[in-house]
Amino acid sequence: MEIKIEVAGARLDKALADLTPLSRTVANEQIKEGKVLVNGAVKKAKYTVKEGDIIQYEVPEVEEVSYEAEDLPLDIVYEDQDVVVVNKPQGMVVHPSAGHTSGTLVNALLYHVKDLSGINGELRPGIVHRIDKDTSGLLMVAKNDQAHVALAEELKDKKSLRKYWAIVHGNLPNDRGMIEAPIGRSEKDRKKQAVTAKGKPAVTRFQVLERFGNYTLVELQLETGRTHQIRVHMAYIGHPVAGDPAYGPKKTIKGKGQFLHARTLGFTHPRTGETLEFTAEVPAIFEKTLEDLRKG
């Protein structure tokens, strides 16, 4: 495939990873193997891209993996020949990993959706972006590589719409605002993320929807998509997500999980160019908790 550089100054490997669905590792492998051409010539990873450069790269062949298709309940909000939008329940892991080899969204997708994309040389059934196990809500899934590339580029260009609802601890001092703080792996706990000067830029916008004394219902819009971004940002400003097992206090709304829901998802359809927007109401336990908070 081919891309044209519009903003100069980055290393070739970083530009390739930023502008395509390829990971930085796969981008470097292709560069070392001479599979990446800049204006028809092989370049090293440290080459600084220039405006107008034409970069050619290979879409890796998909290697079949042994994830099993499982007949699990799957709330499909929308589906066509290119895209599926699913409403993931709280508690479901998106992708199989050590300790989570079954019961994941990918296992369910393999059963319900037969044609799925494979990017970076591995069959990751169409997963363009992820939400945490304990977060419920909307995810877009690509059914072919062309759709996957287009949707991934839209995410990187910050053109897609992703809004969440969360119940957070305390009362935010402002009705709306923006949290701009870089996020990277925590140096104290490698399993967690943290606001750190060494992290990647991260921006979250928030708007207060309702106040309940010790808790607040907020709508949060992602400008970037860092791991655990909303959870880290809200904890950083002193208002962690209620029920958050990693970033929240021990004293919280008990026994009901994490109150974070991906409620609104919008994107440009990769084939038709139509703007699509979907909304999934909060789960029943989330709504019941709101009712209880309103009663005081």
What are these regions (language model features)?
Residues M1-G296:
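RNA pseudouridine synthases
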